[in-house]
Amino acid sequence: MSEQQVQELEKKWYALQVEPGKENEAKENLLKVLELEGLKDLVDEVIVPAEEKVVIRAQGKEKYRLSLKGNARDISVLGKKGVTTFRIENGEVKVVESVEGDTCVNAPPISKPGQKITCKENKTEAKIVLDNKIFPGYILIKAHMNDKLLMAIEKTPHVFRPVMVGGKPVPLKEEEVQNILNQIKRGVKPSKVEFEKGDQVRVIEGPFMNFTGTVEEVHPEKRKLTVMISIFGRMTPVELDFDQVEKI
């Protein structure tokens, strides 16, 4: 396909249904399939509608959860042997100072959800995660939708299908897409806390999927819950993200 033909293709935004909790894996898998199938020219962009956050941990405990966007800043945490300083800048995270020296400082910077930097001896870590998902279970694609692309989408791991009406993919309205993109650009505002101590919940993703339990503690600043779940006949506290459970 010539460059002129590619430019003439009409591309619209579509919502793709994906496996909940696997939104980023679905995106990465789709990009690989597009490359293998030679269909990259049909697609302008694939995004997960969520905010990218940096989670910084020290000695096994979460210390900070910060936006990957915004002004450059250095974050220092005290690990097992001393201080590790992470720098968040231009959409990347790297180590600028560590008690471990060059071993950790020279680690490659990270910039994508799922990537992490670990200073093993000092037990400190920075990881990029997707937080405050606008539409859990969906990713967005700007593409010229045709039969070849539809077949590629449907055979991609963790991706199900586009939102359809009458058996045909339905493009999103431009104003809807702009609202979503603006939310991501500004930083998604956390939704109100919908859980309280004593709520009965069902786990909908992760290793405890389909287990039920009772909310013991709510941590709104981290968007996490401590849920008491019966495991092998014993009530066990399990820490879960808000997105991993639903009320019953």
From Swiss-Prot:
Residues 197-227 form the KOW domain. Keywords: Transcription, Transcription antitermination, Transcription regulation, Transcription termination. It comes from the Bacteria. Pfam families: KOW (PF00467), NusG (PF02357), NusG_II (PF07009). InterPro entries: KOW (IPR005824), NGN (IPR047050), NGN-like_dom (IPR006645), NGN_dom_sf (IPR036735), NusG-like (IPR043425), NusG_2_sf (IPR038690), NusG_dom2 (IPR024045), Rib_uL2_dom2 (IPR014722). GO terms for cellular component: cytosol. Gene3D superfamilies: 2.30.30.30, N-utilization substance G protein NusG, insert domain (2.60.320.10), NusG, N-terminal domain (3.30.70.940). Participates in transcription elongation, termination and antitermination. PANTHER family: RHO-INTERACTING TRANSCRIPTION TERMINATION FACTOR NUSG, TRANSCRIPTION TERMINATION_ANTITERMINATION PROTEIN NUSG. Contains an N-terminal RNP-like domain, a C-terminal element with a KOW sequence motif and a species-specific immunoglobulin-like fold. Belongs to the NusG family. Monomer. Homodimer. NCBIfam families: nusG. This is Transcription termination/antitermination protein NusG.
